[in-house]
Amino acid sequence: MKNIKVNAIANLMLRVLNIVFPLITGPYIARILSKTDYGYFNITNTFIGLFIPFATLGIYNYGIRAISKVKSDKDAINRTFSLLFYISLVCTLVTTLAYFLITFSMEGTPLLKTLYYVMAIQVFAQFLNIEWMNEAFENYTFILYKTLAIRILMLVSIFAFVRSEHDIVAYALVMSLITMLNYLASFLWIKHEVKFVKVSMLEVKRVIQPLIAILLLANAGMLYTYLDRMFLSAVALPEDVSYYTIAQTLVFSISGVISGAVSVSVPRLGYYLGINDYKAYDDLVNKGGRIFMFCIIPLSFGLAVLGPHATILYAGERYLDAGTSVILFALRSVPWALALILENQIIFVQGYENRLTVIYFIGGGINLALNSLLAYNHIANPAYYIVTTIIAELVVIALDMLLIRQNNLFRMRKLLIHTGKYMLYASGFFVIAYLISVIHPIEWIVNGALLVNILATIVSCVIYYIIVLALVKDEIFISSLQAIKNKVFKKKG
């Protein structure tokens, strides 16, 4: 068995790498490439996302679980790996063929068609995506080093080959080849530990049904933000798709750092349920959920009040119109965070994933209907599509709560009260930001005045939030202060 502390550190560093590098390359690409060309890339990237799940067929999630169960049996490992690899290879070839047939028959500019063909590399490369084997073997140190090397190569390649506003094909080729190289490196590494063996059609038939079930569960979320981008790709200008994509990337690159805490606690919650220690389970959900909301709500509200500021810092002045989308995505991250707790820590961990899938599809159906209504009326503003997703997700949260209450899975009162309190405390950020904008008005360009405005807003909001937490004697805040004091005095002692 691998050292769990080393794995945890490697996994954390991996998450940081996956957040830091897009925050480096994103601003560069947004400033270098033309808005229309970058919009075409985002349209193409959205389109290939429709095919990739069918190429992988839920094998990633299924493979981790299947290999983890037989790690002590070499023959079983070889058989399971071979079975899943063969299925993945066939699915990838069929999906790639379907992709080319569809894109060949589609209308589009010559540049857009070229991007479709270049990005096909990412669809075809999916059969090499056996990272689930490395995760099952807990090879997190290898994944970390490989990811670091690949990301550095990607960074160098982007700076070397994407130099002018019309280098979009070069950018697409770099991203596609880097994706294939990433998968190939993992494939070559894992081949030292496994070998291919023959499998029967009976074995294939036996796993197809659970693979399809996992495919539906893992990709039901595509009916939300992904569906928005699909509709925008069809009815809006290319730059509108970029506005949506930039806002989504910016907000969830930041909130994604904190959200990892939710998934980390799932194994411990499952352990408590396994030994019937319901008090420990309830305490951990309440405490973990409260800490999560303590962090995510002020972060979300803070990003909302600085939406346009953050947008032009990240992507430049020409993407200022994405500021509204950033505000909406920032506000959306609060119900998203609540849903993450309800679904990952309560519903899923207690074995109600089938019911959860039904709820996802109900919410997705609502989003599909609302998006269709917008498209029918020729509404192409990305902000409206974000609003439809928020509406659908609020319905999902309501159904989550109904499921939890009907089956007596968890008492949500404390969690909801604390969520409401932190939202009330953080709402003062909007007043502070407004007052600062009146006292220190700015132009929407990146200059010293903008940076002063941002700094003043952040400092003022942080001081305000600390004062409020101190006045109400918030338990999380007090315990955090105490922990800091203990560490400081311990070092001095």
What are the residue ranges of the model-derived segments?
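Helix-loop junctions and terminal segments of transmembrane helices
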Residues: P27, T56-S72, A247, V251-G289, ...
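Interhelical loop/hinge segments that connect adjacent transmembrane helices in multipass membrane
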Residues: L144, I168-A172, L184-T225, M230, ...
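Alpha-helical transmembrane segments of multi-pass membrane transport and lipid-handling proteins
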Residues: V16, P53-T56, S82-L111, V118, ...
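Signature of the first transmembrane helix
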Residues: N3-Y60, T96, L155, I212-P238, ...
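Membrane-interface junctions at transmembrane-helix termini in multi-pass inner-membrane proteins
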Residues: F124-Y145, L331-I362
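N-terminal membrane topogenesis motif
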Residues: M1-F21, D75, M201-L217, A322, ...
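Hydrophobic alpha-helical transmembrane segments
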Residues: A120, Y145-H192, P210, F361-A369, ...
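Membrane-proximal transmembrane or re-entrant/amphipathic helices at the cytosolic face
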Residues: R411, V431-G493
